[in-house]
From Swiss-Prot:
<keyword id="KW-0961">Cell wall biogenesis/degradation</keyword>
<keyword id="KW-0929">Antimicrobial</keyword>
<keyword id="KW-0732">Signal</keyword>
<keyword id="KW-0132">Cell division</keyword>
<dbReference type="InterPro" id="IPR036779">
    <property type="entry name" value="LysM_dom_sf"/>
</dbReference>
<keyword id="KW-0326">Glycosidase</keyword>
<dbReference type="Pfam" id="PF01476">
    <property type="entry name" value="LysM"/>
</dbReference>
<feature type="region of interest" description="Disordered">
    <location>
        <begin position="367"/>
        <end position="392"/>
    </location>
</feature>
<feature type="region of interest" description="Disordered">
    <location>
        <begin position="217"/>
        <end position="244"/>
    </location>
</feature>
<dbReference type="GO" id="GO:0005576">
    <property type="term" value="C:extracellular region"/>
</dbReference>
<comment type="similarity">
    <text>Belongs to the glycosyl hydrolase 73 family.</text>
</comment>
<dbReference type="InterPro" id="IPR018392">
    <property type="entry name" value="LysM_dom"/>
</dbReference>
<protein>
    <recommendedName>
        <fullName>Probable N-acetylmuramidase</fullName>
        <ecNumber>3.2.1.17</ecNumber>
    </recommendedName>
</protein>
<dbReference type="Pfam" id="PF01832">
    <property type="entry name" value="Glucosaminidase"/>
</dbReference>
<keyword id="KW-0717">Septation</keyword>
<dbReference type="InterPro" id="IPR002901">
    <property type="entry name" value="MGlyc_endo_b_GlcNAc-like_dom"/>
</dbReference>
<feature type="region of interest" description="Disordered">
    <location>
        <begin position="291"/>
        <end position="319"/>
    </location>
</feature>
Length: 437
């Protein structure tokens, strides 16, 4: 449980009987209580049970946890223009150093994101403050195969959340934040309502030197860490090379592998490494081959592997409405001829709860784009693809309907129907609206 989200007025709860550890759902950003297995555990009491890991100095256990999540966080953050240091600090704060029930195996949900992931979820009783009172609800939380998918999902939230006025977290992106402090300031009041959220992240980043993970994921043709390269062949074709590299602050095996065009597994094998942990000043042998087109001479050019960014498509047009008394997602889906799943996807809703005065996207058509596959590639446009939404057919599920039956009726593959309606399983519900064509 994050320190920054605790109500000090609940200090008297320290004297109560110790209750099972629970987790806090950060997506709603409400300070409250969590009900696990029928036992109500306050957020303050959770803190009292878990204070030690939050105030400890850099120990072997904390460094081990940092390294274990950094291996997933850095490549994901680098590929999507985010600060790895900030993402790692968020994971530490949201999961209380991986001690929250939800962040541990078999759930691996570091950020408390609700919903399902590839059809898998775990249900816990939680309390939310709605309409002036606490309400206990059964809420599904996503279950991931590993920390890597948890970081990818959190990245998707940071890159694609849009309430109609542009990307909601754009100021936290590396392109718009000159320093990690700018990024944490941009998250404060948005990702978390606590005014000290950014300061808490900054303290973790500073104390554990997390900026060492903010180094460039690829470094062009310049060696800045001190390396000696020996070429065994300068002729045209494939040049086999052996390089001794000295680890510097901010280096990771993944970053080095990207810089020199070899895999992490190759580096580990060449240096008999049993993990991805490396140390400043450590000498690493980098062996591999680099493709070259030189017909002679001794000049080398380092080749880096480009990363792929998650860039949301810009909507060509969209319709938004302000929620009024009596509105429900089901009623809005019927009125605007779409599905509840689609409304939740457009508005990044983790539950069916909506609020009076909330702005919701109820209709949206995305502009088509042709990603480049490299220099000299040719993109072919199909003029029929831009009109696919105009022929969409919405079906209300009735008793006896199945995805297979609807696919036979509409002539659309089951996979397409699931993709259009963001279904993670083959389960459909009576009264549900589905796009089937």
């Amino acid at each position: 449980m994050p320190v920054s989200r605790v109500k000090v007025k609940n200090r008297h709860l320290k004297k109560k009987t110790k209750k099972p550890l629970a987790f806090y759902k950060p997506t709603t950003k409400f300070v409250g209580a969590v009900l696990i297995a029928g036992t109500l555990t306050t957020t303050h009491e959770l803190l009292l049970q878990q204070t030690s890991p939050m105030v400890q100095a850099a120990t072997n256990s904390s460094e081990a946890f940092i390294e274990s999540i950094a291996a997933s966080a850095k490549p994901v953050a680098d590929a999507n223009g985010l600060y790895p240091s900030v993402m790692i600090a968020q994971a530490i704060l949201e999961s209380n150093w991986g001690s929250s029930q939800l962040s541990r195996a078999p759930y691996y949900n570091l950020f408390g994101i609700q919903g399902t992931y590839q059809g898998k979820s775990v249900v816990f009783k939680t309390q939310e403050y709605l309409n002036g009172k606490w309400v206990t609800k059964d809420m599904p939380f996503r279950v991931y195969p590993s920390f890597n998918q948890s970081f990818q999902d959190n990245t998707y939230v940071l890159k694609t959340t849009n309430f109609g006025n542009g990307p909601y977290y754009a100021k936290a992106w590396r392109a718009n934040a000159a320093t990690y402090q700018d990024a944490t300031a941009a998250l404060t009041g948005k990702y978390a309502t606590d005014p000290s959220y950014g300061a808490s992240l900054n303290r973790i980043i500073s104390q554990y030197n997390l900026t060492r993970f903010d180094g460039a994921s690829s470094a062009g043709n310049t060696n800045s860490g001190g390396s000696t390269t020996t070429n065994t062949n300068n002729n045209s074709g494939t040049n086999s090379s052996s390089t001794t590299y000295t680890v510097k602050s901010g280096d990771t095996l993944w970053g080095i592998s990207q810089r020199y065009g070899i895999s992490v597994a190759q580096i580990q094998s060449a240096n008999n490494l049993k993990s991805t942990i490396i140390y400043i000043g450590q000498k690493l042998l980098l062996t591999g081959s680099a493709s070259s087109t030189n017909s002679g001479g001794s000049n080398n050019s380092a080749s880096t592997t480009p990363t792929t960014s998650v860039t949301p498509a810009k909507p060509a047009s969209q319709t938004s409405v302000k929620v009024k008394s009596g509105d429900t997602l089901w009623a809005l889906s019927v009125k605007y001829k779409t599905s509840i799943a689609q409304l939740k996807s457009w508005n990044h809703l983790s539950s069916d709860t909506i609020y009076i005065g909330q702005n919701l996207i109820v209709s949206q058509s995305a502009a088509t784009s042709n990603p480049s596959t490299g220099s000299g590639s040719t993109a072919t446009n199909n003029s029929n693809s831009t009109s696919s939404n105009s022929n969409a057919s919405i079906h209300k599920v009735v008793k006896g309907d199945t995805l297979w039956g609807l696919s036979q009726k509409s002539g659309s593959p089951i996979a397409s129907i699931k993709a259009w309606n963001h279904l993670s399983s083959d389960t459909i519900l009576i009264g549900q609206y589905l796009r089937i064509k």
